[in-house]
Amino acid sequence: MKAMKATKKAMTKTGLAEALAPKPSSARRIAPPSSRAWPPSAQEVKKTGKLIIPGLVMVKTRKKPATKAGKREMFGKVVLVKAQPAKTVVKAYPVKALKDNF
């Protein structure tokens, strides 16, 4: 799998804080921080291919190439495999600071 090339600069800590800050228009409904974080995070990953939430997680996208249909040997048996289209895979990794705490 190849890493996607960043098209724009990644979001900074300040930009992330501003995206997660409650907006004045949303004063009527109280939403948990996780639901407020999702739309800006998804947009950032689509735009740059990478998102780091400091101290918690790093989210990266990878391009997985298409596979051809055919026969493959698995555990001594021949298995027919369907062709799969190319796709983008999103993976999340814990950052070092989180790993060190456990």
Curated annotation (Swiss-Prot):
<feature type="compositionally biased region" description="Basic residues">
    <location>
        <begin position="1"/>
        <end position="11"/>
    </location>
</feature>
<feature type="region of interest" description="Disordered">
    <location>
        <begin position="1"/>
        <end position="43"/>
    </location>
</feature>
<keyword id="KW-0238">DNA-binding</keyword>
<keyword id="KW-0539">Nucleus</keyword>
<feature type="compositionally biased region" description="Low complexity">
    <location>
        <begin position="21"/>
        <end position="42"/>
    </location>
</feature>
<dbReference type="GO" id="GO:0005634">
    <property type="term" value="C:nucleus"/>
</dbReference>
<dbReference type="InterPro" id="IPR010992">
    <property type="entry name" value="IHF-like_DNA-bd_dom_sf"/>
</dbReference>
<protein>
    <recommendedName>
        <fullName>Major basic nuclear protein 2</fullName>
    </recommendedName>
</protein>
<dbReference type="GO" id="GO:0003677">
    <property type="term" value="F:DNA binding"/>
</dbReference>
